[in-house]
Amino acid sequence: MATGKIVQIIGAVVDVEFPQDSVPKVYDALKVDAKEKGTLVLEVQQQLGGGVVRCIAMGTSDGLRRGLSVENTDRPIEVPVGIATLGRIMNVLGEPIDECGEIGEEQRYAIHREAPSYEEQSNETSLLETGVKVIDLICPFAKGGKIGLFGGAGVGKTVNMMELINNIALQHSGLSVFAGVGERTREGNDFYFEMQEAGVVNLENPSESKVAMVYGQMNEPPGNRLRVALTGLTMAERFRDEGRDVLLFIDNIYRYTLAGTEVSALLGRMPSAVGYQPTLAEEMGVLQERITSTKSGSITSVQAVYVPADDLTDPSPATTFAHLDATVVLSRQIASLGLYPAIDPLDSTSRMLDPLVVGQEHYDIARGVQSLLQRYKELKDIIAILGMDELSENDKQAVSRARKIERFLTQPYHVAEVFTGDPGIYVALKDTLRSFKGLLAGEYDDIPEQAFMYCGAIEDVLEKAKKL
């Protein structure tokens, strides 16, 4: 194996000089023995000429110095895949960080792989029921599709994702991969213990677990956060290629972009709009195109997307939009009214909300709900200035129903039971459609609107109304 030496260190970016005849390829993994710090892995990003390569460190570069010997492995970063990864927490390099011994994998895959070709891809469309009323009604998910949860800080992306993991992963009993990209370590910890309680992680017999976890948290260097999503995706691809249906949860895709921004300037690239890397669209495309279903199995991905300053036109969320089949937009305005989940039914969209896919009845009910809410939104200014009395009878009725619908779109979550004390409710799609159909038809006009708050199907509302 060829050896070189470090010639420059700037934060997470390290330049290494090799003999001219043995320069490493782009994406090759290099190893540095940093004595007391252990072995550090570098990933080649650029060849600068003169035998010098520019690399990103997959760990902290503290303790490195010029002149240290670097070894070329002649291979890209490879991570464990297969059954051995289930029930384990790993870092970007696939090393265990849960203090439960070695992974003991039978096979390793390189994290950089080609996306499946057109011939291999599957184009079947079937619905994935989530048990969350507003999602199943307004922005239904596709099995094998890509779903984005968009929202600013503190409006409930992670809680919604946890509920989806609880409802889909536990109900659908398939395998899941959870990639924590640049999120809080506490959330990763909470998730691990919740999965143990739910029986999804089995510590006695890890091979019976249903989820593999890969974490590159907020405190990690940018190299880890930039590559950890690829590590999780590689593990999911292996399960898919074995003919399984996999769920891939990524929290948060924005931090993946941000890590690219952090190293982009150090790699000598000119920043583009808002300081993002010029390769933003390409980096996002490389990741998203690999998340796809083939004829052998499917990957359904749910990605949380942080929206900086609640601005959906920011280049990072705007680039992500283009790749998704369903977008769930969380609204700070709805959250401020105390209506949770704070999903905006007018902003959220889905490719699956099509009469040919969900059926004419579902489509009509969803559009009916949206048009009522839109009418209420238009009338809000008039109500604020002149009051309800100035509205026509039709408009008064529309406002009354819209307010009931707004409240009926709320729902107690299983994962929020700890803070709210209300037991979570899973609402089947047929119950959701039946309930909203009755609401639109005016069957429940005589029921007070507070009875609609935090209920499951319409039977719960009628039960609650009796107690009021």
UniProtKB/Swiss-Prot annotation:
It comes from the Bacteria. SMART domains: AAA. Its EC number is 7.1.2.2. One of its GO terms (cellular component) is plasma membrane. It is a peripheral membrane protein. Keywords: ATP synthesis, ATP-binding, Cell inner membrane, Cell membrane, CF(1), Hydrogen ion transport, Ion transport, Membrane, Nucleotide-binding, Translocase, Transport. It is an enzyme of class 7 (translocase). GO terms for molecular function: ATP binding; ATP hydrolysis activity; proton-transporting ATP synthase activity, rotational mechanism. Pfam families: ATP-synt_ab (PF00006), ATP-synt_ab_N (PF02874), ATP-synt_VA_C (PF22919). InterPro entries: AAA+_ATPase, ATP-synt_VA_C, ATP_synth_F1_bsu, ATPase_a/bsu_AS, ATPase_alpha/beta_chains, ATPase_F1/V1/A1_a/bsu_N, ATPase_F1/V1/A1_a/bsu_N_sf, ATPase_F1/V1/A1_a/bsu_nucl-bd. It is found in: Cell inner membrane. ATP binds at residues 151-158. Its main location: membrane. PROSITE patterns: ATPASE_ALPHA_BETA. Belongs to the ATPase alpha/beta chains family. NCBIfam families: atpD. Produces ATP from ADP in the presence of a proton gradient across the membrane. The catalytic sites are hosted primarily by the beta subunits. F-type ATPases have 2 components, CF(1) - the catalytic core - and CF(0) - the membrane proton channel. CF(1) has five subunits: alpha(3), beta(3), gamma(1), delta(1), epsilon(1). CF(0) has three main subunits: a(1), b(2) and c(9-12). The alpha and beta chains form an alternating ring which encloses part of the gamma chain. CF(1) is attached to CF(0) by a central stalk formed by the gamma and epsilon chains, while a peripheral stalk is formed by the delta and b chains. This is ATP synthase subunit beta 1. It comes from Photobacterium profundum (strain SS9). The gene is atpD1.
